[in-house]
Amino acid sequence: MRQDDLKLLGKIVTTHGIRGQLKVASFSGEFDTILSLETVVLKGKDGRMETFPVARATVHHDRVLLSLTPFTNINEVLHLISAVSYAHRDQFPPLEEGEYYWCDLIGLQVVTAAGTVIGRLDSILPTESHDVYVVRGADREYLIPAVEDVVVQVDLEAGTMTVSPPEGLLDL
């Protein structure tokens, strides 16, 4: 199995009901990607990775309920609790222009419009109004709002994100 195109999605937190459904906590907070999957790759506590067909996926409160083939009862899935879920990138649904999956943004080099390297995009914090990019520089961490006025360009091919931070933002 090629692991270079596997993208981290979430974690199995518990079971649901007696028919072998699993509750998945999405790391990105969005569900559409998980709901669209035909297969999911689970990495167990032992580090072993297994691929399972998705029989059904639905949203339940702040989690996704997954039914995986061939499981039909709770006893068959108990060993999957705490497994981390991945999917192959080519299964993700297409996005609108200017939209990006978090997994595609993490690791981008962040530079100012003037060409100054700020650091690498390390993680993303979801907030009510907009996401916040956590950028690790050489000696500190920067919080960059993910808004059009600040994020000028994302070039996935070049591996860069160009930002035009308001005066003083990088001094905070």
From Swiss-Prot:
Domain PRC barrel: 97-169
Single GO MF annotation: ribosome binding
GO terms (BP aspect): maturation of SSU-rRNA
Keyword Disulfide bond: no
Domain notes: The PRC barrel domain binds ribosomal protein uS19.
Protein family: Belongs to the RimM family.
Subunit structure: Binds ribosomal protein uS19.
Name recorded for this polypeptide: Ribosome maturation factor RimM
Originating organism: Geobacter sulfurreducens (strain ATCC 51573 / DSM 12127 / PCA)
